[in-house]
């Protein structure tokens, strides 16, 4: 069996996805390096959202670069959703055929009074379950309903099944950040290479 996760020299192939996406509403460029060190360089014009993207990189141990220019004079909806679309597409490209990945990941993350949970299946079957009763409508200038919109856009475009749940909490900032951190930990586990996994981790023989 040929190990397609290695290049012609026998070294593990680099897993990087790059996407540039421009519409009448946004202009976005992202690079996602799955075998990274938790580095982030992001600027979307939405400070709280930048902080959340930093959490994804840091806690998944991936490297993430994102630049977004959007119609923030209206609101942040297009910028956040379209960044999710671009990141989902970049993740899908970085994964290739999914050879040698662990596929599944899950994590509980406590953040003071909040307990958040995430489960990821790199399945090729996009789906989102988002179960979080966020008490505040805004954190800074960030509309909190955009957290769900971001994760939906990412999951649909990456081809992953994603379950997110806040089991309990009171502080909306903590609840959203807990979800981003839990997602990061779960994703990091799911996309990690495992030398025991020969080929694609599916009895169908393909993930995508």
From Swiss-Prot:
Main location class: cytoplasm
Originating species: Symbiobacterium thermophilum (strain DSM 24528 / JCM 14929 / IAM 14863 / T)
GO biological process, one term: L-histidine biosynthetic process
Protein name per its UniProtKB record: Imidazoleglycerol-phosphate dehydratase
Family listed: Belongs to the imidazoleglycerol-phosphate dehydratase family.
NCBIfam families on file: PRK00951.1-5, PRK00951.1-6, PRK00951.2-1, PRK00951.2-4
Keywords of the record: Amino-acid biosynthesis, Cytoplasm, Histidine biosynthesis, Lyase
A single MF term (Gene Ontology): imidazoleglycerol-phosphate dehydratase activity
GO CC terms: cytoplasm
Entry superkingdom: Bacteria
Pfam families to which the protein is assigned, alphabetical: IGPD
Pathway annotation from the record: Amino-acid biosynthesis; L-histidine biosynthesis; L-histidine from 5-phospho-alpha-D-ribose 1-diphosphate: step 6/9
Record's catalysed reaction(s): D-erythro-1-(imidazol-4-yl)glycerol 3-phosphate = 3-(imidazol-4-yl)-2-oxopropyl phosphate + H2O
EC identifiers of the protein: 4.2.1.19
Subcellular location: Cytoplasm
């Amino acid at each position: 069996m040929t190990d397609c996760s290695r290049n012609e020299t026998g070294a593990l192939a680099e897993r990087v996805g790059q996407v540039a996406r421009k519409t009448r509403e946004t202009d976005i460029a992202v690079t996602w390096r799955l075998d990274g060190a938790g580095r982030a360089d992001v600027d979307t014009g939405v400070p709280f959202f930048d902080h959340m993207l930093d959490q994804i990189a840091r806690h998944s141990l991936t490297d993430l670069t994102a630049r977004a220019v959007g119609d923030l004079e209206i609101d942040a909806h297009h910028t956040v959703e379209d960044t999710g679309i671009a990141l989902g597409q970049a993740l899908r490209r970085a994964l290739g055929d999914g050879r040698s990945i662990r596929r599944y990941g899950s994590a509980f993350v406590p953040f003071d009074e909040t307990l958040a949970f995430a489960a990821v299946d790199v399945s090729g079957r996009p789906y989102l379950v988002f179960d979080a009763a966020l008490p505040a409508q805004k954190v800074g200038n960030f509309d909190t309903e955009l957290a769900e919109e971001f994760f939906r856009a990412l999951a649909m475009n990456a081809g992953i099944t994603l379950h997110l749940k806040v089991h309990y909490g009171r502080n909306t900032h903590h609840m959203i950040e807990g979800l981003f951190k839990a997602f990061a930990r779960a994703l990091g586990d799911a996309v990690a290479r495992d030398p025991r996994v020969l080929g694609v981790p599916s009895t169908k023989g393909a993930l995508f």
